[in-house]
């Protein structure tokens, strides 16, 4: 459960990320594909080379979904319902992949925003990404 302090930390961090969210999303995807090669199996139709347009486009989709979650932090299940349906019923993404991407997002954000990435912000973002992952996997049951 995100505390009021966690919610403030997440919102502040996301504001600091600002217009770079899409770039960071793409970098996190690349990082995930390189660090966890089995995750590539969900993207057989993508050009997975560094800087590909498809990775950039999907990175922006990831970032936009996270921005939506931040903007609806008190109702993430409602805000992410359609995305949860998509990943559970159509794409059938293994839930462990959300944890892997969350880790790669944390690493990417920490590398680009070291001043903002305090231990408290790190913990809050980790809890936030876990909450988003829980929502996205909620319809698997």
Swiss-Prot record:
It holds the Pfam family Globin. The keyword Metal-binding applies. Heme b binds at residue 87. GO terms for biological process: hydrogen peroxide catabolic process. It comes from the Eukaryota. One of its GO terms (cellular component) is hemoglobin complex. InterPro entries: Globin (IPR000971), Globin-like_sf (IPR009050), Globin/Proto (IPR012292), Hemoglobin_a-typ (IPR002338), Hemoglobin_oxygen_transport (IPR050056), Hemoglobin_pi (IPR002339). GO terms for molecular function: haptoglobin binding; heme binding; iron ion binding; organic acid binding; oxygen binding; oxygen carrier activity; peroxidase activity. Red blood cells. Residues 1-141 form the Globin domain. Keywords: Heme, Iron, Metal-binding, Oxygen transport, Transport. O2 binds at residue 58. Involved in oxygen transport from the lung to the various peripheral tissues. Heterotetramer of two alpha chains and two beta chains. Belongs to the globin family. PANTHER family: HEMOGLOBIN FAMILY MEMBER, HEMOGLOBIN SUBUNIT ALPHA. This is Hemoglobin subunit alpha-1. It comes from Varecia variegata. The lineage of its organism: Eukaryota, Metazoa, Chordata, Craniata, Vertebrata.
